[in-house]
Amino acid sequence: TKGPVADVTLDELPSIFPDYADVTIPPHIAPLRFRLSEPGDEAIAVLSCGNEKMITAASTDGQFLFPEKEWNKLLDKAIGKDIDVKVYRREKNEWQSYPTFLWHVSADPIDEYLVYRLIEPGYELWNKMGIYQRHITDYEQTPIIENSLTNHNCMNCHSFCRQDPEKMLFHMRAELPGTYIINGKSVEKLDTKAGEKVQSLVYPSW
């Protein structure tokens, strides 16, 4: 299976977002998605490693969404090697090809979960936030705690003890202020009150 026959070969790499050109990725990561800034009338990406190939057409707004099953098959083939990414775009009746860029697939695994606080950019809606975990192999996001359960207060600065998911702490402000320590199924609130004032802690470290 091949991509289109190009009428014109371009000199510059495609303008994509996020900029995934020539990066190293971990094995067994969820399919990378990117958008072609100028998709034209049609766009196609050809991913290949050795004899393993997959071809995906972009959506109308230029986004490439790679099927998970085919992606995982290609990724398994490419561990410790490179995936060649070739992007084509059609403008009217003319196919254009961009130079190939690479994704190097590391043989070294990384932790399967990321944890982060999710809040609107610019903090305009700080009263709607939460701390979430994302499984990097399938990109599923699940909440650890959302402030819809705590009167829409501010929560921040979560930290795990030596990357142990069973032991962490985070701070809350406004309603229910304080520092909370989770140890397995146990939750403890630290008493940080000095006199009549609750001292808000920041930037924890184990």
Predicted regions and their residues:
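Sequence signature of WD/YWTD-type beta-propeller architectures
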Residues: T1-W206
